[in-house]
């Protein structure tokens, strides 16, 4: 399984919001509002297509929960099969993940830290690691 191991604040700047979990004053998004890459291209950007906007929102959700594409696709397939609005079902499934629950309860500062707490075995569910 491959996961993103590059600079986390680069993704914050790329998607225009704090995704890395750092405090707002320490995140790269607050220091530099421009997206990463060539600076001369900033004034020449066109309006993104509908597909580009949908892809950007999907990637933003993926990086917010720090999951890989295959996991995200499986969550989407499960959400579509459930009755109701598939987008709401998808967000509900993502919120039910153990690392997100630990993050929401305040046991960790970031979702990455919550994943590390789980993988190191500090959290057990029904006496199972």
Please describe what each predicted stretch is.
Residues 1-105, 129:
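Ferredoxin-like alpha/beta domains used as RNA- or RNAP-binding modules
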Residues 111-129:
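A contiguous pocket-lining binding segment that forms or flanks enzyme active sites
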């Amino acid at each position: 399984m491959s996961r993103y191991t590059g600079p986390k604040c680069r993704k914050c700047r790329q998607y225009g919001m704090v995704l890395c979990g750092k405090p707002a004053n320490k995140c790269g998004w607050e220091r530099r509002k421009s997206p990463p890459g060539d600076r001369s291209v900033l004034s020449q950007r066109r309006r993104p297509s509908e597909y580009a906007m949908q892809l950007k929102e999907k990637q933003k959700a993926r990086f917010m929960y720090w999951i890989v594409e295959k996991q995200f696709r499986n969550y989407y397939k499960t959400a579509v099969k459930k009755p109701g609005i598939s987008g709401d079902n998808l967000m509900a499934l993502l919120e039910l993940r153990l690392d997100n629950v630990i993050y929401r309860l305040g046991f960790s500062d970031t979702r990455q830290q919550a994943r590390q707490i789980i993988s190191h075995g500090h959290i057990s569910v029904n006496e199972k690691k």
